[in-house]
Curated annotation (Swiss-Prot):
Residues 135-154 are annotated as: Disordered. It is a multi-pass membrane protein. Belongs to the ATG33 family. It comes from Saccharomyces cerevisiae (strain YJM789). Its main location: mitochondrion. GO terms for cellular component: mitochondrial outer membrane. The keyword Cell cycle does not apply. This is Autophagy-related protein 33. Residues 135-148 have a biased composition (Basic and acidic residues). PANTHER family: AUTOPHAGY-RELATED PROTEIN 33-RELATED (PTHR37278:SF1). GO terms for biological process: autophagy of mitochondrion; macroautophagy.
Amino acid sequence: MSVCLAITKGIAVSSIGLYSGLLASASLITSTTPLEVLTGSLTPTLTTLKNAATALGAFASTFFCVSFFGAPPSLRHPYLLYGMLAAPLSSFVLGCASNYQSRKYSKVSKESSLFPEDSKPAASELSDSIIDLGEDNHASENTPRDGKPAATTVSKPAEALHTGPPIHTKNLIAATAIAIVGFVQAVIGVYGEGQFI
């Protein structure tokens, strides 16, 4: 194997490994972080991760392509083709899911804007009811002088805080799995050629 071919394969495998790691990091961040934080303070970080992953995926696919088509016919192994397709396939999965979810979200938001506020179903009153089984002096503090209990404000449940388009965690995990499988088979393929010995 020529030195140039070994270098291009090494760059391709390293790039697909970094690409898989970035997708895994993005999956972990989006699955463990609330939506408000993702759409607020983490947006620049996620944008940077997306741009880096796009660049690494394109870089890896290019070097896998150069390694496959630049090799003599006896060294054109299928793992180079599979590695070349891992990044575009995972990007395709994310692109289709994003397009589907954005169309679905815009359709739901259009339908909800057609109904006036009065015709929307009322929220359940059960989530607003609180029974305080604490001390009696707490109840006397909240009771005004006319004998009626004071109205208390209840914080909204966590589900009410999640607004905006849903995060595509399942699709991101599927794209990450595709990239990881591409990376693992590329490492096994390069190792099988004896490049690491």
